[in-house]
Amino acid sequence: MFHCPKCHHAAHARTSRYLTENTKERYHQCQNINCSCTFMTMETIERFIVTPGAIDPAPPHPTVGGQRPLWL
């Protein structure tokens, strides 16, 4: 959520679209009925802080017959 650049009230995203794999164009509209400013923002990935390593898949769940009850 962005704040309106004119009146500083909350502005909700109305629509968005990807321009590239790392850049999104987003349209916002101010929620202040006396303002109703509509503006566009650009979201871009600048850098990664942490990247995922190798993923170790979890073993499958046991079959129904191999499960124990939760209570005795």
UniProtKB/Swiss-Prot annotation:
Report the superkingdom from the record.
Answer: Viruses
Q: In this record, what's one Pfam family?
A: Ogr_Delta
Name the UniProt key words of this record, in alphabetical order. Answer: Late protein
Cited InterPro entries: Znf_Ogr/Delta
Give the NCBIfam families listed for this entry.
PRK09678.1 (NF007241)
Q: What is this protein called?
A: Late control gene B protein
